[in-house]
Amino acid sequence: GMAGHAGTMAMSLRQDALTAAAEMVLAIERIGVAGGDRDGLVATVGLLRTWPGVANVVPGDVTFTIDVRAGTNTTRDRTVDVFLAALKEIAERRGVEIEIIPRENLDPSPCDPHLMTLMETAVQDVTGEPARVLVSGAGHDAMIMSRLAPMAMLFIRCEKGISHNPAEAVLPADVGKAVTALTRFVRLFADDYSKTQGRHSA
C-alpha cells in the first residue's frame, strides 16, 4: 500500500494496506468455512504485522501468515489456489501490491488403516460406543514416526474441544478410559501380530 498521514490523506485516495489485509483475512475465513470441514480443512491467519505501526499513519505495509491444513494434499492445494485468486483480486481492486512467499509444504501423515481398525475396536470394547474418527491438523511426533513405521493415534476429548490453551481440560474418567483403551489396543495388536507371524511361518 501507501503510507500517509492519517489526518491529511483523503479516504478516497488511500491505498491502505491494513484494510486490504483485513478483507483478505475475511476472505480466507469465508473460503475456509465454505470448505465445510472437507478432509479436515482448516485455515488460520495467526500473525499480522503493520508498518509503520503508529496510530496516526495509514499503514503502508502489512505482513500476515496463512496456515492451511487438510487431510489430503488435493484438498489443501485446491483451497490454496482459491485463496491466492481471492487475495490477488482484492489486491488489484484496492490498488495494493501483494507478494506471496511459501514457507512450508508438509504432506499429511495418514494413520495406518489396519492400526486404526484395531484402535477403533479397542475404543468400542472399552466404551461400548463406536470410536469417533477425526482428522488431526496438528503436528505430532506421529508425523515423523510414520516415516519409520505404521502409526495410529488415540485422542482424549477436551472440554469444549479447547486445546493449546491454558483452559484445556480433560476429565480423569476420560484419561482412565483412554489408558484402558490403549492397553486393549496393545493386546489386540499383539494377537494380530502373532496371527500374522503364524501365517508367514506356516
Over which residues does each language-model region extend?
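Zn-dependent metallopeptidase/amidohydrolase metal-coordination segment
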Residues: P130-A181
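Short amphipathic alpha-helices in soluble, non-transmembrane regions
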Residues: T79-K88
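Short, conserved charged micro-motifs
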Residues: N73-T79
